[in-house]
Amino acid sequence: MNNDNIGREPIDVVYDKRFSSRIKPKTKKKKRNENRMRLVRIQHYIYNIFTSFLCLFIVILILYASIDISINYGPVIILYILILELGSMLISYILLQFPFFYRKLKNTFMRARNINKYSHQYRPLYYDNNSFTDENESFNISDDEKKEKRKRKHTYSFMSSDGGRKRSNFRRFLSSYKSKKGNEFVNSKTMKNKTKKNTRRKGFLSFNWIGYKNGETNKNRNDNIVNDVYKKYNDDNKYNDDNKYNDDNYNDDDNKYNDDDILNSHSEQDQRKKKKKKKEKRIVVFPRNDTGGNSFKRESIYIDDCNMWMKKTMRKSNRPNFKLTRSLSFNINMNKDDDLMMKDSASLDNIQIFLGHRSSKFLREKNKLQKRKTSIYNKYVPLTFASSYKDDFFKEILKSQTDGIISSSSDYSSSSEDSNKNVYKTIYINNNNNNVDKKGKIDEEDNIVVRNNIHSNENIIIKENPYSLRNAILFHKEKRKYRKNINTLSDDDNKNFAFHSGKKKIKRKEKKRRCFIKLKCFNKIKNLYRFFINYNMKSSKSSNNLYLFFRGFYIYTKHRFVHYLSYEPIWIVAILIRIVLWCIVWIWAASYMERKPKNFEITEWNMKNVPSFYGYIECTFQWCGVFDYFFGLYFSNNKLKYIFSFFSLIDFITTPVSSLIMNFFVQDNINHNYWFLILGPLRFLRLVRAESTISSCFFWLNDVKIIIIGIIILALAILFTFSGIMYILEAPDIERDFVKPLDFVYFGVITMSTVGYGDYTPVTKAGKFLTMFIIITCISFVAAQFKRLKEAMFSPKTVMGIIPKQDDDYILILGPVSPTQLLYICKGINNSFPNSVESIFLFTPLPVVIYRYVYGSIVKNTNIKICISGGNECFICPSIIYDAVINSRALYILNNVDSEKYTLMYQQIFLASNNINFNNHDHQNQRISSDDILHNNIINKYSKDKTKNWKYSDLFSEYKNEINKNNMLNLEMNININNSYSIKEKDDQECLLRFIGTYNICNSLIPITLQLSNNTYEELIKSMNVYNYISIEELKYALLAKSVNCKGLFFLIINFFYKPKAVKSLKKYIIDLKLLMYNGMLRRKNRERLSSSNLKIKQPSQQKSRKGNLINKISLFFKKGQNHQLDAEGISHDEKNNSNTSRTRGNNRNDHMDPQIKGKGVFEMNQKEQKQVMLKEGMNKNMNKNIIKDMEKNMNSNGKDNINDSINESIEKNDLFFLNSLDPNDDRNIHNLSYKNYYYMLEKVNLNMYYYLEGLKYNIYRFQFPECMRGFLFQTASEYLYQKYSAFLIGIITINKEIFLNPVNYIIGEENKYFYTSAFSGIILTTSLDSLIKLSSINNISKKVYEYNKRLIEEKYKSTFSKSWINSDDDHHNSDHKNFVTNTQIKETQIDGDEVKIVLTSHDDSLHPSDRSVKNRKNSMKSIYNQKKSNLGDQKKKNRNQDDRTEHQVDDNNDSDYLQIESVPKKKRNMYYSLVLGICELENYISAYKDAFVDKDKPLLLVCGWPDNIHMFFKYLKRNVYNSSYRNKNNSNIHTYDNNNNNNNNNNIYSKTVKNKKGKRKKMKKLNDDIKYNIIILSLHVPKFNYENDLFNYSENVVFIRGSPLNSYNLIQAGVFYAKRIIILNSNHSLFIDKDAYRIDNEVIIIKNIVNQLFNYISKNKENYFNLLRKTFPKEYIDITINERIFLNDNINNSPNINEMIKGKMSDSSYDSLDDNYSSDDDSSSSNYDDDDEDNDNDEDNVDNNNDHGGESLLLKKKRKKKNMIKLKKRALNVNNIFNINKNPYLICLIKNSESLEYIDGSINLSYENYNDNEKMNKIWENCGEYIYTFELVSANIFVHEMLHNLVSFSLPISKYAIEYSVIYSLIGIDINEYSKNAQKFHKNLNLSTGYVNLVPIPSYFYKKSFYKCFSYFLHNKLSLCIGILRYIDISSLSNKSKKIFVLSCPSRTMKIEPHDQAYVIAHRM
């Protein structure tokens, strides 16, 4: 099958002659209309031809005149033109940035004062160390620094303000120095002078540390890093017998370089190192005598060194010798034998190796080789922010393995060697040639290789990919050299080579081609050539590549450079500056003009005295004026109108054409400069446009100021024009002394002011007429201008900006759009679709004043022309906006998404209460309860005292009657705190009314987009066929509902619609975040040093004793935290079942608490308990002994540096260490674990923030498939685009907005076979619009990709051919395109060694369907399967009969919903109900699980707040696709043998399988519609009833508890400790009278902190938890039924539940290994349905066997319905499960305004009230949407409502590359497509199916491997597209209690997978 010819065959259209007779003849009216249309077209053509010829004529004329005047001056004019252009732009830049320059100057002059003011913040922290003798009072210097010389530029460590040139800080800190030998005193000045000669200044960031001279300082560590990576640390050489240092000499023989093993770049360094080092004097510090007689050494650590480091690195990031450890002020040459430094050395070494610095570790084997592996993809790994230089050897080695470093050593290796031979290369680094043979071989026995053992807690079967090795070769870019040897080629290549070798011409061409290929620039030029060919925005009919190249280059430069420059304020102001300078030049040159007195002819002026340099200046200005004229003509939409406009005619007159015309009429050969001076006064008229220029560029000026400046400039322009013309006409007048131009300026002022002194009167007629004209003009001018000024000062402004004209390309927006949404829309267009929108016209009823700063920031930072008209509701009436609607490109009708912000803020909501007193004296002591609110009393008629016993017969009717009564009372009283729904509803109605008014005008002309808050009128809008419709509230709650199970989903999707531009601020934010975390740890460390007095510098003899002490400390460390655990063999079966199945991690510090409690419920230990405790202690002792033995072995083998490594291994093997060793009261234990890997954790956070930044660059676009991809399988195309271009192809979209995500079986271009109207487009995630255009312009793809694609398609056809002949013959014509993967069975095998195997098996009988053996085999398999089903059915009938005895009889007419309602009250007849909007109001969490919830095993979802639209949240939570755990598990097992049917019974069997599948689908739908959570709503207020927020359908899963989440007591009552998910909604949580949007956001933030503090409080001490239980659950604590099982049971053996409640077992839900689709909760819930599923299978068989008896089938159906409900009700309350504490629940906060985020993260600057106007405009633009990169939002815990504001910018009318925002619904699993029957058939023919985003675990095999391997695994094995990673990172500096979530979208190919990572994949629906 040739895929290249698909869709290219011509379509033959056949006409039938029978229909020709039916065609009516044309009437006269139709002929007239046709003739008119032809005339209009002809006129249009004539008009276009005329304008084009006129423009061409003007351009040629101006160019001819300009070249004519510049011939005499030569090419120097070009230099002058450049100087003038650049100079004017520089002046304009200074003027535009004047406020910023003023601010910088002010800061520089005020900085000296602030230093003294804040000097206390820069004081160092000191700690004192006891010294042994006076001789040893020196800093210990390591051997690394001893054997290296480094020449430093200046000192940086002590923050000297002069940049290190003056040692002022040294003078304060140290007074003198002492030498080692002669006890010489050396001052800092003398030391500096001595070393100044030997030092060379380099651009390095380095330090001069105390303790040695500059001459003895180290060299660049990067230069010597190859030679000194691992050195032996010799304790014997370090100290003398007299405790003195010896200077080690450098051994040249032992440290030679081998040229074969070391990089050539270090050859120059080798020659330097071969020179002998000279011994120099060592500087020793004098000790300071303490009062106690002991001498102390004081060391300082500056906390604020980090901030200075940040500023320096931000300025100069390419300095190659930057040291992280020195910049962090931590490596201050302290003794490495110190205890504290020893514990931190492991983590420091990881950072040093990670950044390419020298490691401080030393191995005992001096000359061992080290193996390191690098990846071939290291070119894709960018620099991190921590590494600030490029040329670093170790960084190049560790680029791709950044996350693979462990604390044991810097070595690492892959878990598989065979599969990575082609991927990795080995680099050997050594110091000498001892281990290298003559042949270059290496002894592998001596090599040290540390392997990372992967401990997988999952039994995941991984399959081998047969295409994995081919893909790496297929897409890898290799520059292959041409080989002359023919023997190395294949047979086919040999034939081709021999065939071409005989032709000389072909050989020459090949040689030329090889020469071009060798050139580096050739490929780039070739790619650019292709890029410009395919860049044409409009499809061109021409096929000439040269024409297309120039046309594409023209369009690219126009849209990317020229168009952008034309709207830049710098360019516009520069034009104005050149006009002013040009006018000044004329005044200067005109003063040299002479003419005889009383000779008023124009041609009699004498120009001899004019300077000759004036010609150069005038020619330069003339050329600049010509360029300005051409620029305006080029970008004008109506060129004819532009040519004949007033300003254009003035510009045309001032060009050189005027001198050419004057010379043509005046035949005297006069110089061109003559006419330039004569016509020079007209150039002043070009200043008339200054007002519009100032208003568009100088945003900080007020409107009144702009008008005043405009009036002044206009008056000056008229004045100088009139004075100049009068000077040319009347001068000189010697009698009245009017000779110079300035004299006539005086006359002009008198004339324009109509004063008329009479000292001069014009003589000529032209002068008199001109004077009269000016007088009349000025009278009208002054009156009009002053009237305009008065209106601007006293009248409200209704228009802001320039109203677009009829011919302009603009987008019209109607409605009260909030300023923030307008800003988001414009910024989204500018960042994602630059230059796609020319102008925006906004009609709004809101006051225009509120858009002032937003308008200025948009115009200043974008090329978008914006006009805002509004101020009154009548401004957007249909009659007024008719013309604007007709001429627009698209229409957007938007509502006010921030309506509460502008309306509720100014409204007072009154509360009717008897107890509320608003006196000023009593408001502090007054409390308002919920019963005091009149509205709550109305809604909840039945209070606690007056409870009513509800019966089922009266339940439904009385419920509705009470609702109706309460609703009427609400309407009458109109009192409700949460009345935002009415405000939004009113705003939606007004918006809908505007839509109806404009729908009749432009429905068929332009697309309409409608945005509403609620979805009340959704059906009406869909019936009107609106182009785009979005409900903000519905989309918000849909995203929240889908994110409940799929963590971080809303944040992942929103990232696709954002692209932050403030990259510099983001880098600064990441560095600030890192340094804040570092400062917190450093302060803690300094406190410990100040408090500890045992810090001593220990001798080498004392090092041996430290080993034993450390072992004893570790053994004590293990003993401390061990709590009482039951023996594994003695654990009862009930305890195993009731224990929490979620995995516990190292951050659970208090997982097991002691059972002894003081106070009530004290437990006494029985004899059995004591025996168990003794058994556990003995077990723990044995475990500790084994651990200590392992550690001693590691210490003996690897040295003392591996002690921490052995601790790590023991931690991984023994869970007791993590679970029980951390005593919260023991600070030493926390110190040991927190400081161990702290520095490595800092770099890990930094690196992941960088990965997140890279993912933010991706946006979602519409992708037009190139022609070369026709015939590609979607799977091949997605893999190819990601492998080669790092783009994610995730789906396709049709012209009808039908979206299909991950259609694995779709073949690109196959829709043309079925004559589809337009080709499908792709949905792609890529970095920019340019990269998207580059992808759509791909022309050539390698042949291997085509072969790979063909092989994939053939294998899919083979696998599906077996199913095509089983099915009926009716669908035979579609067998080639149907069900590619349905019959493909993937057999998973376990990992054999390090290999991953994937076996694709299909039926062997597919090739021979007529074989009888095959049929017999099928029949035997089918019979076996039926026998198994029948046996299972017999067993289940018995169980069913037993269950039927307990069932009650139900009428046949009752449906399933009625049964669900009836089953509740029959079991709970004595239950008291108080219904609120359809759900029960209960007291606390225990009563909810005891009495209300139907399914007790479901996890808890706590919802804080009750907004008006919460029913939308429950609706989408019920429709959650992620609840389909049953479908995921059983979809592949449904009738696997149904396809193996006998051909004789094919029809009957096929009908049965269809029925069985339909039944399964119905059951799966019912299971999916169920909410998988028990929900508790905690709120103080209840919204008003509006017939939509009725929650009666969710009463089985939802319960209401009245209380405020601001009160911790109410939170505990609602079960905050036991909730798996917590959602804090944006609603009123307090009883304030006013409802401010900002105040509600602040309440959400307060609740978030209260929840976190509650968990911290109970984690500190177990007594705190029990005290809270006694207070919050007093009744349940006394209750016998609960207390006997939990509180008062003394027998531990008989009460397994005590482990859950009393010991406070806390399950960590921060990361679930299988998260929610595979979580234990879903497994438990799905396991409960197993019996029901089997029953249904058996019932379905019975139904099929008894088709003739319809009555029996009906009874079976009814029994099935009853069983499902009865089995749920039979489940008893499992107190064990409901008291499981989720220590780290997933919490989501909903915030309305982004300004409130400042209280969460202080680095976010979102408040602009303290800035002036210009700074406010800049800050608004810079910070708009940039909060999305903050550390809090990365964890997907905060949902900001403003994130949805920019979705309007991603729609097709904006750009043809824009995707519809309806793709969000497809991503979250909601199919909004409505297909007809024909469309469904068409989709089946193309094998189209859509997917959704799901969160799945990543197999442990891929840990520490690149993301690309994981991507290919999911693509080939799971048929899923991986688009993101959910990562957990420990960010706690001093404890291991929690982990932070990182949502990384669109990861890079080389990013390493870490443990516990989960993947966001777009799953494929079968």
From Swiss-Prot:
The keyword Iron does not apply. Residues 1138-1147, 1532-1548 have a biased composition (Low complexity). Residues 272-281 have a biased composition (Basic residues). Residues 744-762 dip into the membrane without crossing it. The chain crosses the membrane at residues 77-102, 570-593, 613-635, 642-666, 673-693, 706-729, 766-786. Residues 236-259, 1127-1137, 1148-1157, 1405-1414, 1434-1451 have a biased composition (Basic and acidic residues). Coiled coil: none annotated. It is a multi-pass membrane protein. Residues 1713-1743 have a biased composition (Acidic residues). Signal peptide: none annotated. GO terms for biological process: action potential; potassium ion transmembrane transport. Keywords: Host cell membrane, Host membrane, Ion channel, Ion transport, Membrane, Potassium, Potassium channel, Potassium transport, Transmembrane, Transmembrane helix, Transport. The keyword Membrane applies. One of its GO terms (molecular function) is potassium channel activity. Residues 1421-1433 have a biased composition (Polar residues). It comes from the Eukaryota. It is found in: Membrane; Host cell membrane. Disruption phenotype: Repeated attempts to generate a knockout failed. May form oligomers or interact with other proteins. Mediates transmembrane potassium transport. In the Saccharomyces cerevisiae heterologous expression system, a truncated protein containing amino acids 1-1094 localizes to the plasma membrane of the yeast cells, while a full-length protein localizes to both yeast plasma membrane and intracellular membranes. This is Potassium channel K1. The lineage of its organism: Eukaryota, Sar, Alveolata, Apicomplexa, Aconoidasida.
